[in-house]
Amino acid sequence: MSEFALQIDNLRKTYKGGTEALKGISLKVKKGDFYALLGPNGAGKSSTIGIIGTLVTKTSGQVKIFDIDTDKDVATAKLLLGVVSQEINFSQFEKVIDIVTTQAGFYGIKKSIAKPKVETMLKRLGLWDKRNDQARTLSGGYKRRLMIAKALIHEPKLLILDEPTAGVDIELRREMWDFLKEINANGTTIILTTHYLEEAEQ
């Protein structure tokens, strides 16, 4: 077992039409690291995160998550991952608590165990008072929190986030950043994209 949570070797991504988003990048992230991919729009950050999270198909190259080659055993790799993309990934008409509870069930967490886990997660993210609200009524910042709750409910070893604080006001951004640092301090490796230099420098 290596010391790395993520190993990328010569990763390339070319989209239909010939747009080359990634031109052979290589990267290693150690277990327990908090790693930020910094760059302007169009730099390939979202493509990289999407490929790591198995949401985007790579053109070539190798991706290993805790030594698991995603080409050979993507199912096991997914169990180790929590993914927060930029796009909303839940029904806007479902209740907040139901969205996270359903996600727990997807990972095989028994209802008796899931119930207190969901309550704890929603409280930590400031969503407990909104647990019976439909997701469509939430602000953009709270929808982002809900996506993080979904991604963390199965306690992944690696959390990846694509612009988690984009479009969020300064106060909420600070709260989310503090929460992510707390998660990292408890042992979860975190990789995120950002175009905020001050965040990357933390």
Predicted features and spans:
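Conserved ABC transporter NBD signature motif
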Residues: 61-69, 76-77
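Conserved ABC ATPase "signature" region
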Residues: 101, 105, 112-130
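Conserved ABC ATPase signature
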Residues: 134-138
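Hydrophobic anchor residue at the start of the ABC signature
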Residues: 148
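A short, proline-enriched helix->beta-strand linker immediately N-terminal to the Walker B motif
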Residues: 153-157
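Catalytic Walker B motif of ABC-type/P-loop ATPase nucleotide-binding domains
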Residues: 159-162
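Helical segment within the ABC ATPase nucleotide-binding domain
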Residues: 173-186
